[in-house]
Amino acid sequence: MADNFSLHDALSGSGNPNPQGWPGAWGNQPAGAGGYPGASYPGAYPGQAPPGAYPGQAPPGAYPGAPGAYPGAPAPGVYPGPPSGPGAYPSSGQPSATGAYPATGPYGAPAGPLIVPYNLPLPGGVVPRMLITILGTVKPNANRIALDFQRGNDVAFHFNPRFNENNRRVIVCNTKLDNNWGREERQSVFPFESGKPFKIQVLVEPDHFKVAVNDAHLLQYNHRVKKLNEISKLGISGDIDLTSASYTMI
């Protein structure tokens, strides 16, 4: 379930032929709406001022020697979007995917601490391009962490880092339907440390979940519950101090 490539390599774009790759919106973001760095404002004549900007007046710097318009303002067409932050956080302003979440968010609990176990409501279910982010700190001498994407009493996706299973550290993923657990998928790469902070990100894709921890891709888990709109809650439990839990669209 895991591979050895870095998150930086995986962020080369949404057209990445590697099916494990994270979308290009993470880390290598294009400029925001209207950005087009280095391009002229859309219109018939390159260098033309944006509509409504003092008709008849030349844009700054268009004619050498002409009085400068709007001192200190950048020339039209060179408004780059905000710089992308470090790691896997998308910037606001990314268009939302079609589905129940028309805006980008983030939505969820404000910065904590939050009481564990904690339930994050997912009204409308989950949809492709939905990104869930959990921040916290592993407690000293921790035994387990669990994330449960729930559909009623069923668990569509169980993500369960275990710190000491027969003296081994392992991550177990599974699905529970009609009170019966399915086949376990086990992951030996274990990025969690007792007493250390962590960031878990879960990205919903059309046919699987992707999980990254501390900005590095960890695993993916194919959907066993196909009706994603019925997954209405994320349960967070285990030996952690929970700081925040939220979701957004990318």
UniProtKB/Swiss-Prot annotation:
Ranges for region Disordered: 1-60
Modified residues (Phosphoserine): S6, S12, S188
PROSITE patterns cross-referenced by the UniProt entry: GALECTIN
CDD domains: GLECT
Keywords, sorted A to Z: Acetylation, Cytoplasm, Differentiation, Disulfide bond, IgE-binding protein, Immunity, Innate immunity, Lectin, mRNA processing, mRNA splicing, Nucleus, Phosphoprotein, Repeat, Secreted, Spliceosome
Modified residues (N-acetylalanine): A2
GO molecular function terms attached to this record: carbohydrate binding; chemoattractant activity; disaccharide binding; IgE binding; laminin binding; molecular condensate scaffold activity; protein phosphatase binding; protein phosphatase inhibitor activity
Keyword Electron transport annotated: no
Low complexity compositional bias, start-end: 38-47
Name of protein: Galectin-3
